[in-house]
Amino acid sequence: MKYLLALDQGTTSSWAILFTLEGEVVAVAQRAFAQHYPEPGLVEHDPWEIWESQLWAAKEALRRAGVGPEAVLALGIANQRETTLVWERDTGRPLHPAIVWQDRRTASLCEALRERGLEGLFRARTGLLLDPYFSATKLLWLLERVPGLRERAERGEVCFGTVDTWLLWNLTGGRVHATDPTNASRTLLFHLETLTWDEELLRVLGIPKALLPEVRPSDGDFGETLPGLLGAPIPIRGVLGDQQAALLGQAALGAGEGKCTYGTGAFLLLNTGERPVWAEGGLLTTLAWHLEGKAAYALEGSVFVAGAAVGWLREVGLLGESHEVESLARQVEDAGGVYFVPAFTGLGAPHWDPYARGAILGLTRGTTRAHLARAALEGVAFSVGEVAWAMAGAAGLGLKALKADGGMAQNDLFLEIQADLLGVPVLRPRVTETTALGAAWARGIGAGALSLGDLPALWREEARFLPRMPEARREALYRGWRRAVERAKGWVQEG
């Protein structure tokens, strides 16, 4: 029997999941790694911890399954996007900690580019906004701040990559410096329609092209693992950014189909077919994938904080463990007038305000831990609701249902709240780690074992959550939410 091995490298941990060709989970392994916050608004990872945790997870998944590497048809990668790394081409030594997608240190760089009137150019070429979220200004910051880095980059001595590229480099022993279009499309340097690095944007930012990885199709040939890593070489046949992998794993293959992945942040993607749809309101135009020789596009809306809101409750002592949030929040019927705006690192779509910060409003002497727990869940659900309706309107589609996956999708109360605040059913698949499943399916396609047309029949619904809240109540809650968001905006003052 042959298997597919998915490496799912996330913001807080690295996963490896072994699947059958039909998408059934055989074994799972996960290892967490440290987040570093050197200053407010700065978020970093140790590149070696990313690699070592991912390698451990891959070995452990095979061990738990009792499967040797020769039984693995192919390996695929899904990864946190935008996170930016640079390393020496000769030695593979990282030259700075990885700057994580959540990091806001380049807000002033983005503002300077906007003041130069460049937002329209970047939007037209990449589908993205000038925001610290994306890789380009992180890379520019490194080139300006790390001594000697620009000179070495111009001589071709330095590699830049997102996390997929860093993993590929290490899996292949430095033989492959590559990425796929979904990851490239999140850098602010990639032309959405030509599917190439954009020479004009590189000139505008002063980024040497010699730094950049080769772009290969999402189901392309990315080499094979070094024999000593997993016991024998394994072909690498699929690479996708994590949110695009989840869209594929939800079998959202047609225009108008979409999903929301609830991880550290919440990420909504709506498939728009073979042509990009350009939208306002903070929505992004992006690649869904490049599979079977064709590109598919999507609209994306990002909520920077989702599961991280529950993590914050735990860190400040309101919860013992994250999973306790559901039972605690069930102790109350509502949030008691409390609004929790989870803008710890700014606001994503539809607001895109890097200067916003988190806020809890409406506190009284009667507010309890349970009210705060429920308000945190509602804050994430409100944020997702704003994005979902904006996305459906921009694409000219009615919102009929939302497919949910990721860690928070295991929380029944949260999905009940999400359905109530959206006013449409929320569907949970049997395999909720659809990011890894999408990576597995991409590599199955790359290995010739699957086709896109096979995927809808392999997707299974596990649960359906129906809205029960009266429309008048929903509208009243949203009015309060909008007031709370306005209080959180523009909180950080430059200088």
Curated annotation (Swiss-Prot):
The gene is glpK. Pathway: Polyol metabolism; glycerol degradation via glycerol kinase pathway; sn-glycerol 3-phosphate from glycerol: step 1/1. Belongs to the FGGY kinase family. Coiled coil: none annotated. Sn-glycerol 3-phosphate binds at T11, R81, E82, Y133, D242. Glycerol binds at R81, E82, Y133, D242, Q243. ATP binds at T11, T12, S13, T264, G307, G407. GO terms for cellular component: cytosol. ADP binds at T11, T264, G307, G407, N411. The keyword ATP-binding applies. Keywords: ATP-binding, Glycerol metabolism, Kinase, Nucleotide-binding, Transferase. Its EC number is 2.7.1.30. It catalyses: glycerol + ATP = sn-glycerol 3-phosphate + ADP + H(+). HAMAP family: Glycerol_kin. It comes from the Bacteria. This is Glycerol kinase. SUPFAM superfamilies: Actin-like ATPase domain. NCBIfam families: glycerol_kin, PRK00047.1. The lineage of its organism: Bacteria, Thermotogati, Deinococcota, Deinococci, Thermales. GO terms for biological process: glycerol catabolic process; glycerol metabolic process; glycerol-3-phosphate metabolic process. Inhibited by fructose 1,6-bisphosphate (FBP). GO terms for molecular function: ATP binding; glycerol kinase activity. Key enzyme in the regulation of glycerol uptake and metabolism. Catalyzes the phosphorylation of glycerol to yield sn-glycerol 3-phosphate.
